[in-house]
Curated annotation (Swiss-Prot):
Organism phylogeny: Bacteria, Bacillati, Bacillota, Clostridia, Eubacteriales
Residues recorded as bearing O-(pantetheine 4'-phosphoryl)serine in the entry: S34
Gene that specifies this protein: acpP
Post-translational modification summary for this protein: 4'-phosphopantetheine is transferred from CoA to a specific serine of apo-ACP by AcpS. This modification is essential for activity because fatty acids are bound in thioester linkage to the sulfhydryl of the prosthetic group.
Taxonomic superkingdom: Bacteria
Assigned GO CC terms: cytosol; membrane
Keywords, sorted A to Z: Cytoplasm, Fatty acid biosynthesis, Fatty acid metabolism, Lipid biosynthesis, Lipid metabolism, Phosphopantetheine, Phosphoprotein
Gene3D superfamilies membership: ACP-like
Subcellular location: Cytoplasm
NCBIfam families registered for this protein in UniProt: acyl_carrier (TIGR00517), PRK00982.1-2 (NF002148), PRK00982.1-4 (NF002150), PRK00982.1-5 (NF002151)
UniProt protein name: Acyl carrier protein
Molecular function GO terms recorded: acyl binding; acyl carrier activity
Keyword Lipid biosynthesis listed: yes
Similarity annotation: Belongs to the acyl carrier protein (ACP) family.
Protein source organism: Clostridium perfringens (strain 13 / Type A)
Domain Carrier, residue spans: 1-74
């Protein structure tokens, strides 16, 4: 899951996959703004064929937060 997520993040935020770790924060480490994050969530929803409610997405600060959320919500 992490590798797939890294591909999507690198594409949407125009960063190198090598810069992306589980601890990377979207705003401080990866240079995303709020619009970037919205677009990233939309891309994840499309790629993973799932819906991520806005209130859940607001809690995503790090790449690890997203991996944990997706893992929890796709295993059900």
């Amino acid at each position: 899951m992490f590798d797939k997520l890294k591909e999507i993040i690198a594409d949407k935020l125009s960063v190198n996959e090598d810069e992306i770790t589980m601890e990377s924060t979207f705003i401080d480490d990866l240079g995303a703004d709020s619009l970037d994050i919205v677009e990233l969530i939309m891309a994840l929803e499309e790629e993973l064929e799932m819906e991520i409610p806005d209130e859940d997405a607001e809690g995503f600060k790090t790449v690890g937060d997203v991996v944990e959320y997706i893992t929890e919500h796709t295993e059900k």
